[in-house]
Each structure stands twice: as C-alpha cells, then as structure tokens.
Amino acid sequence: MQFTDFGKLDLDRLPSPCFVVDEIAVQRNLEILNHVATASGARVLAALKAFSMWRLAPLISRYLNGSCASGLHEARLGREYYGGEVHVFSAAYSQAALEEILPLADHAEPAVVQDGDLDRDAFNCSGDQFL
C-alpha cells in the first residue's frame, strides 16, 4: 500500500496551525469504498460531520455517491462542493432550519420539529425520498 513519505516534509515551511493530509492514502481508501459500493450495490456517502475537508471534495466526489449532513451548513457544503446526493438527518430541527435545509437535500429523515408540529408536507426535497 502506498503512502506519502512525510519524513521528507519540511515542517519549517508549513504555516501553523495547519492540517497535513496524506492524499494518496485518502484516495486509496476512496477506491476501496468505491469497490464496496460497486460490488454491493450500496450508495456510499461522505459523513461531513466526521471529515469535511472541502478542498478534497473534488477527489471525494469522484468516488462516493454524495454526502450526509446533520445541519444547514453541512448540507450547503455537501450541495455546493461535494455534489451527488445530499442526505440530512438530525434528531430535531426548528421550523426555520427545515425551511432552509430541505431545498438542499435529496433525502431527509423525518425528525421532530422544535417549536411546532412536524408537517410531512413541509418536506420538499429535490429527491422526494423519505423513510
């Protein structure tokens, strides 16, 4: 398995703080995930809560089917940078948050609406898919 040799990295030339990512290792992992998706028929999504390094979005979007988000800003990041499907879920959304997040979503898991009743008709995702 190939990895970048970080022993040759000149740490004095890096800004501080910064993130240093082994893009070769990320791509290798994406290739594995893509193989799993192809072999199983599953759709694999990037969990933006866990890894939302948007500069790698073009690479990630070549291998995965989309992203999953738990809030408005993650959903916007998924829609604008990652492409593909955008799935959203949270245990609770305010009515105002729902109105902003649903136009960005291809799939939304029904959740409790704070400060109001859940209106299933309010779910107007571009994919119109609900569990």
Where are these regions (language model features)?
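N-terminal glycine-rich anion-binding loops that anchor highly charged ligand groups
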Residues: Q2-F6, Q27-S52
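Short hydrophobic/aromatic segments of transmembrane alpha-helices and their interfaces
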Residues: L9-D10, V36, L59
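Generic N-terminal amphipathic, Lys/Arg-enriched alpha-helix
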Residues: Q2-V21
